[in-house]
């Protein structure tokens, strides 16, 4: 988490909630899977579909990782979560990033997916601010994740 921000996810309900503060260089929270025990080959899939509730119109990031280096490149897509909705995240549209900074020269290894992550951050990409970010409490219920 960033600075004094904190969050938790309830594995039974999929409710991810917490409090975001900009104190102590904060302004973001995240939740991620543990690295998968063997990479997923998603080469027959076009992307990931997320079904959610309670997003309150906030702008979140969905991250797919093809490396266990959690300080390395990740594949990121931003989405606005209405109260109830579905978002399709095509692999072809994901942005390679390292800590919200875009990078070039990398290719997503669709046959080597090792983790998934959600983030809520005051930053979009390359220092640009998230237009739907507020400090304070947030809630996102992740109802379903599936490949399509």
Predicted feature descriptions by range:
Residues 1-148:
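Beta-rich carbohydrate-recognition modules and glycan-binding surfaces
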């Amino acid at each position: 988490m960033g600075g004094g921000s904190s969050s938790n996810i309830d594995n039974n309900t999929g409710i991810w909630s917490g409090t975001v503060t900009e104190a102590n260089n904060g302004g973001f929270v995240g939740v991620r899977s543990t690295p998968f025990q063997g990479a997923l080959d998603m080469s027959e899939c076009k992307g990931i579909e997320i079904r959610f509730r309670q997003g309150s119109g906030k702008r979140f990031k969905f991250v797919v990782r093809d490396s266990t280096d959690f300080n390395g490149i990740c594949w990121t897509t931003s989405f606005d979560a209405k109260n109830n909705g579905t978002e399709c995240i095509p692999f072809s549209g994901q942005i390679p990033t390292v800590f919200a900074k875009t990078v070039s020269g990398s290719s997503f290894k669709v046959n080597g997916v090792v983790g998934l992550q959600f983030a809520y951050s005051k930053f979009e990409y390359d220092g640009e601010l998230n237009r739907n970010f507020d400090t304070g409490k947030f809630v996102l219920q992740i109802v379903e994740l599936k490949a399509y």
